[in-house]
Amino acid sequence: MHYELHGRMEPDAPTLVLSSGLGGAAAFWLPQLPALTQDYRVLVYDQLGTNKSPANLPAGYSIESMAVELLELLDTLGIRRCHFIGHALGGLVGLQIALLRPQLLQSLVPINAWSSPNPHSARCFAVRLKLLHDSGPAAYVQAQSLFLYPADWIAANSERLARDDAHALAHFPPTMNLVRRIEALLAFDIEAELPRITTPTLLIANRDDMLVPWQRSQHLADNMPNAQLALLNYGGHASSVSDSEPFNQILLDHLAEQCGQVAAA
């Protein structure tokens, strides 16, 4: 898989692993890199079957498959401890890693994530799949911002979104890869295993997320023994892009607290 390392490169530098959502792109995290790379080594990567990590994803592809692929990359790079930050699908990957290899994680930050299928989100993804199958990639890409951002932000950033749409269409993944990634996130269900996740966890959610109800993060916080919730009022599903400054500050505060606790121990 394509990956990039940014920030501090000393062997003892605290390491952050950032995992993006359905689009799978390392570039999703560009609004966070200036804030995070001052004090941390930051790994971003293109998930398999997306962007610069071409592959034909097999039938039965799952969130666990994605977690295992990332663990193999981290093993290759010699990363044995990290703080994991994942957006939506990337948050599910982090939750899966917390079950597969809890000793890897110093802390976990799932953003607008969930633990089991939700009828509202399933309806949204069904609409996106229908757009893809019936109208093609251009319609799918054009509709994407409606699920990701607040209406006023979309109106104020129309030129930027036009550029983003053109880039997304030019780099659109194989249709079956996208279908299998959506199927994987819709099938994800670790409800019965939540009490096993004891990694220090900060859940970040947005009240105005129209794709994933913020109550899904509240549910995670209520059912994981070492988790808390930070709830933002504005920014939509991708507030890390649409309102990055308060989002970044929440991350920095969390990481400072976690790294301080490690140093004290």
Swiss-Prot record:
UniProt KW Endoplasmic reticulum keyword: no
Keywords: Hydrolase
Domain AB hydrolase-1: 14-123
Gene Ontology BP, a term: uracil catabolic process
The protein's Enzyme Commission number: 3.5.1.-
Catalytic reactions of this protein: carbamate + 2 H(+) = NH4(+) + CO2
GO MF annotation terms: hydrolase activity, acting on carbon-nitrogen (but not peptide) bonds, in linear amides
Signal peptide (UniProt feature, chain positions): none
Hydrolase as UniProt keyword: yes
GO CC annotation terms, alphabetical: membrane
HAMAP family per record: RutD (MF_00832)
Functional summary from the UniProt entry: Involved in pyrimidine catabolism. May facilitate the hydrolysis of carbamate, a reaction that can also occur spontaneously.
Membership in a protein family: Belongs to the AB hydrolase superfamily. Hydrolase RutD family.
Full protein name: Putative carbamate hydrolase RutD
Organism: Stutzerimonas stutzeri (strain A1501) (Pseudomonas stutzeri)
